From Swiss-Prot:
Subcellular location: Nucleus; Cytoplasm
Signal sequence segment: none
One GO process term, biological-process aspect: response to estrogen
Main location: nucleus
Subunit structure: Interacts via its C-terminal region with the CH1 domain of CREBBP and EP300. Interacts with all TFAP2/AP-2 isoforms.
Molecular function via GO: transcription coactivator activity
Family: Belongs to the CITED family.
Role according to the record: Acts as a transcriptional coactivator for TFAP2/AP-2. Enhances estrogen-dependent transactivation mediated by estrogen receptors. May function as an inhibitor of transactivation by HIF1A by disrupting HIF1A interaction with CREBBP. May be involved in regulation of gene expression during development and differentiation of blood cells, endothelial cells and mammary epithelial cells.
Biased composition (Pro residues): 103-125
A Pfam family per the record: CITED
Region (Disordered): 15-64, 95-130
Name used for this protein in its record: Cbp/p300-interacting transactivator 4
Taxonomic lineage from the root: Eukaryota, Metazoa, Chordata, Craniata, Vertebrata
Length: 185
């Protein structure tokens, strides 16, 4: 009935006479009461016995309807099946002149160590047997043509690509006039 009304919390529509005047018959005015009486829940419905089970006494742990779980573990004891099948691939180095060492080799990264008593992990297939795009070698000529096509060969000539645009916002910093049609600082 009053779904379309938006009332502030603590106000209610209750057919009550004003405190100083008696009710004027069945057409008593509906007034907004700023505070509800103790027996009403926000003035909208009478408060009776709470529904559902009684709350547990303080100091006890509530387990729900089925009681405590006898085999509760916060984390699964066995890893998911997909986690054991993943093979780690070496990532291409960021330094082109530096060769990568195989895992476990002196000077190279240490490989994953199996847990004591665990069976030895299966050997990884060679890179050429993967059949994926990650294993294909890219021709240097193809890289050079991409570099020229994308304009990456000019990176050394354009310091703003390294420093960011904010250092060259004003052309007065460069010591030359701005190009025609550009916005000045």
């Amino acid at each position: 009935m009053a779904d379309h009304l938006m009332l502030a919390e603590g106000y209610s529509l209750v057919p009550r006479p004003p405190p100083a005047a008696p009710a004027h018959g069945p057409h008593a005015l509906r007034t907004l009461q700023p505070y509800s009486s103790p027996g009403l829940d926000s003035g909208l419905r009478p408060r009776g016995a709470p529904l559902g089970p009684p709350p547990p006494p303080q100091g006890t742990v509530a387990y729900g309807a089925f009681g405590p779980s006898p085999t509760f573990q916060p984390f699964p004891a066995v890893p998911p099946p997909a986690a054991g099948n993943a093979h780690l691939q070496p990532v291409a180095t960021l330094y082109p002149g530096r060769a990568t060492m195989p895992p476990g080799a002196p000077g190279g990264p240490s490989g994953p160590q199996p847990a004591p008593g665990a069976p030895a992990p299966p050997l990884q297939p060679p890179a050429h047997a993967l059949g994926g795009m990650d294993a294909e070698l890219i021709d240097e000529e193809a890289l050079t043509s991409l570099e020229l096509e994308l304009g990456l060969h000019r990176v050394r000539d354009l310091p703003e690509l390294f420093l960011g645009q904010s250092e060259f916002d004003c052309f007065s910093d460069l010591g030359s006039a701005p190009p025609a049609g550009s916005v000045s600082c």
